[in-house]
């Protein structure tokens, strides 16, 4: 399986912060926002990663992540010249995907749970079709809402419904088999001129191949797309890290635990950050 991070948004809801710096490179507490979706892919065991970025941002991304060698993975980049919707990432990445399955994660979504690895394993077990996650919210009217049966099969999806059929929404993490490329190619733009990821999921549901993994109520999902949510996300990351002593979305730690890099490499990274708490954390792995 390959992984795609869609990190090409202008971040207009974060202006003027994102005029000089693109949104995925903004800090969320102690690390760049892009580390959070990257950590998800690493935790899922995905080592071939494509990051879709805005025009003119190749330099900053490459200075931060390079080609992935420091994490023992392969990272490549593609530019989304014009914002055409989330599903456009599947077309931009079609050559990268090739004959493989793919995991798509949004660049401003933050996921945290001590049981996250187990949820990812559940999603990866569905080798045919697609798998999304069901996240409980009290008021789902501003989101894409999914209804599913006792077997975890989606039975309805509604985008920002006035009267939701469930309290479960779909966060920005999607697992697809290889037929997703064909599905994306056959999409028609929506009324707002975009290729909607909801339409991709609806097609899988029509084929009775859309699976839903229900997340427990203690699972943390954050969308850091506005100034308030960015601040709240940073505060939550700090709160959890201070309380547990475990860093959220530390790519070096995940790569080390999975055997992608050795301790010598971790210590070299730690030495580069020796004046920071992040560097000291790496020293103790």
Predicted regions and their residues:
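Short, amphipathic C-terminal "tail helix"
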Residues: 261, 266-285
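A short acidic, often aromatic-flanked loop/helix-cap motif at beta-alpha or helix-coil junctions
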Residues: 83-86, 139-140, 163, 220-221
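Glycine-rich beta-alpha junction loops
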Residues: 57, 109-111, 136-139, 161, ...
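Conserved donor-nucleotide/metal-binding helix-loop-beta segment in metal-dependent transferases, i.e.
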Residues: 113-141
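Conserved N-terminal catalytic core of the sugar/cofactor nucleotidyltransferase
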Residues: 2-5, 13-16, 26-27, 31-106, ...
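Catalytic-core segments of class I nucleotidyltransferases/pyrophosphorylases
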Residues: 103, 117, 121-124, 153-253, ...
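A structural signal for short hydrophobic beta-strand segments in well-ordered beta-sheet cores
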Residues: 25, 146-148
């Amino acid at each position: 399986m390959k992984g795609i991070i869609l990190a090409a948004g202008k971040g207009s809801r974060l202006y003027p912060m994102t005029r000089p710096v693109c949104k995925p490179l903004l800090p969320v507490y102690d690390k760049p926002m892009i580390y959070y979706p990257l950590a998800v892919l690493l935790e899922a065991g995905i080592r071939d990663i494509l990051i879709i970025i805005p025009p003119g941002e190749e330099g900053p991304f490459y200075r931060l992540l390079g080609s992935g060698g420091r994490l023992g993975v392969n990272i490549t980049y593609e530019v989304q010249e014009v914002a055409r919707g989330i599903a456009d990432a599947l077309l931009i990445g079609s050559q990268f995907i090739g004959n493989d399955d793919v995991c798509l994660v949004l660049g401003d979504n933050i996921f945290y749970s001590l049981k996250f690895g187990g949820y990812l394993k559940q999603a990866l077990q569905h080798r045919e079709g697609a798998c999304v996650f069901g996240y409980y919210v009290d008021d789902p009217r501003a989101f894409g809402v999914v209804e599913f049966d006792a077997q975890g099969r989606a039975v309805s999806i509604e985008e920002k419904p006035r009267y939701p059929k469930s309290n479960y929404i779909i966060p920005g993490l999607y697992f697809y088999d290889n037929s997703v490329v064909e599905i994306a190619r056959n999409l028609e733009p929506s009324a707002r001129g975009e290729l909607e990821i909801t339409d991709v999921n609806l097609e899988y549901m029509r084929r009775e191949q859309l699976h839903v993994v229900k997340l427990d109520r203690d699972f943390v999902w954050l969308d850091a797309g506005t100034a308030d949510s960015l601040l709240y996300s940073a505060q939550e990351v700090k709160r959890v890290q201070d309380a547990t002593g475990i860093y959220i979305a530390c790519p070096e730690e995940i790569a080390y635990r999975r055997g992608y890099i050795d301790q010598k490499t971790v210590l070299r990274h730690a030495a580069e950050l020796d004046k920071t708490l992040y560097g000291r954390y790496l020293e103790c792995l």
